[in-house]
Amino acid sequence: MSMKDNIITIDGPSASGKGSLARNIAAHLNFDILDSGLLYRVYAYLYDCGLEHSKIVSHIKKDIFFKTDLNGLTIQDGKEDITGDLRSEKTAKAASKISSLKETRSNLLELQRGFYSSKGLVADGRDMGTVVFPNAKLKIFLIASPEVRAKRRYLELQNRGQEVNMLALIDDIKQRDLKDQTRVLSPLIPAEDSVVIDSSEMSLDEVLSFTKKLTKRKLNK
C-alpha cells in the first residue's frame, strides 16, 4: 500500500472519544468516515443471528445499509432497523469477543480498506494505523483514564434510557483494555509514528482544535 496523503487514522481504547473526533474531523475536511467498531458490531450481530463467518461479509455488502440524516446514523439489515441492537452493551461485548478471532479480522480487513476513496478517509478503531492503513499520513492514538471513559459511557447510555452502574462500567473498561492490549492478533498499541493524545482533562473542542492543527501541518488541510 502506498503512502496516502488523505487518510487519517484514529485509534484508541473503548470510550476514548474516537468516534466523536472522527466524525468532526471528517466533517471539517469533507472526508469519508470508517467506523470500524461499528463494522465489528454488525459482524457480531450477524454471527449471533446464525450466519457463518464465510457468509457475513457478502451479507454486509449486499444487505446492510448505513443511513445518515438529521437524527444521526441508522443501520438497516434489509428493511429492519438494527441500530438499537448494535448500540447495546450485549453487542459491544460480543464484538469485543469475536474481534479476537483470526477469521473475523481477516474477513473484515479488505472490507475496511474498501472504504478508502480519493475524497479522503478518517478511519477510527483499534488497529487502523497499525494494520488496516499502516501508511496513513496522519495517525492519532487517543487515550483517557478508565474513570473518565467510564463517565462518558455512563452519560451516553443514560441518554439512551439504559440503566448502568458506574463501578461496573469502570471494571468492564479495564477488562476490555487488558483484552485489547494483550491479544495476539492486532493488539491495541499506538503505531510508532502516531501522535498520542491524552484527552482525560480535555474537552472535545480542545481535542478537535489540536487535531485540526495536526491536519494542517501533516496534510496541509
Pin down the residues of each PLM region.
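ATP-binding Walker
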Residues: 15-16
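Walker A/P-loop
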Residues: 19
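Hydrophobic anchor at the beta1->P-loop junction of P-loop NTPases
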Residues: 8-10
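ATP-dependent NMP and nucleoside kinases share a basic, alpha-helical "lid"
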Residues: 83, 90-95, 99-160
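N-terminal phosphate/diphosphate-binding loop that engages ATP/GTP or pyrophosphate donors
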Residues: 27-89
